[in-house]
Amino acid sequence: MIQFKSPGNWLFIVPWIAFIPWYGMLIAMLICWASQGHPIYWFMHSEQFPVYISDIGATNLRPLFISCAGWQGLGYVITVALEFFQRSGYLPFQLKKKDPSISDSTSYAEKLHSGKYLMPPYYTKDERNLIFAAFVLGSIGELALLFSSIFSTALYHRVHIAMVSVFVVFMFLSTCCLIAEYFLMGRHYASVHPLASPHFNPQSSEKSFNQDYNTVDELPWYKWKGHVWNKFTISATLKVIWLTLAVVWAICFGAINDRSKSACFEWLLAFWFGIIFMILSADFYLGGRYRQSRYFNHVESFSGYYKYDKALGLYHSEDVLPSDDNAGVIATETASSNIYNNSSSNESIQVVV
């Protein structure tokens, strides 16, 4: 029997709050249309079964359509913003400020338990930028969906179609950014994972006998080493599967001339859209439990990774002895400040996360 483990935080509920009303709207629309006897509305030009979502949304259910489209859109944007927040400690567009409890702390173990990061921080600036891009692109896409519900197909058909197209394109790009973010995080985590292959050690100064590269960054982008199928990679793969099917069904929706079949694909896409929220919720749940992870606290070193180096205060080497807090040996490897500022000074540098 599968036992539900206590979450690290309750933010994983946010995606569910976002998409459940969306599902409720879709079901309510179908029920209303069926109870009315499957009518063909005055602005429609041919018989079809079923009708498009926007056709029902252009009737007396228009307020429901607008409110639920707006709620779902706001929920998606907040969800991506929370992804950024949990991995960085601040929201997109929010100015960073010094947190003494983090920057002045003396060990990596203490920082893990400090509450600064609710999910594992990103490893490079590329991942940070991808989350931010997903947030911006998703905001534009969801605004387009809201406008498509406001400009009904009955009264503003061309504007409605244009807004739907903008929504599809920008949500595709937003999802691509999330996929790239998770693949990058999975690629870096694979190399430091305790289950990584013993023939690949990115912290070692000696190359393995069957390995031509020392670090992940020296590997070609298409090569992976270590424990490849970690939680980040699995999540990215699920998102790829979701997006691939969504693209196929979106093409069918737009390309098929039979309006009845086209409408079927639109309804399928609308319900399929909720699945991405479920995947994001799983990301939040698993990521929020990283302090209790079977493997994360036993990673020997995150040395050289952007966010972790900053969280460590960067430039002192020390061994953190086993304790009740860290439940294992965590060696925090760092470098002297002159590596980063080309100065001869060995004085430590404090970096605000």
Swiss-Prot record:
Kindly report every residue range on the membrane side named Extracellular. 33-62, 152-160, 254-263
Q: Which residues lie on this side of the membrane: Cytoplasmic?
A: 1-11, 84-130, 182-231, 285-353
- Record's Gene Ontology CC terms? cell periphery; plasma membrane
Q: Which residues carry this modification: Phosphoserine?
A: S208
Tell me one GO biological process term. Answer: lipid metabolic process
Report membrane topology: Multi-pass membrane protein
Where does it live in the cell?
Answer: Cell membrane
Q: Which UniProt keywords apply?
A: Cell membrane, Lipid biosynthesis, Lipid metabolism, Membrane, Phosphoprotein, Transmembrane, Transmembrane helix
According to the record, the segments passing through the membrane are 12-32, 63-83, 131-151, 161-181, 232-253, 264-284
Which Pfam families does the record associate with it?
Answer: Frag1
Taxonomy, superkingdom: Eukaryota
Q: Which InterPro entries match?
A: DRAM/TMEM150_Autophagy_Mod (IPR050911), Frag1/DRAM/Sfk1 (IPR019402)
What is the stated purpose of this protein? Answer: May control the production of phosphatidylinositol 4-phosphate (PI4P) by the STT4 PI 4-kinase. Mediates proper localization of STT4 to the plasma membrane.
Q: Which family does it belong to?
A: Belongs to the SFK1 family.
Protein name from the UniProt record: Protein SFK1
Gene name as annotated: SFK1
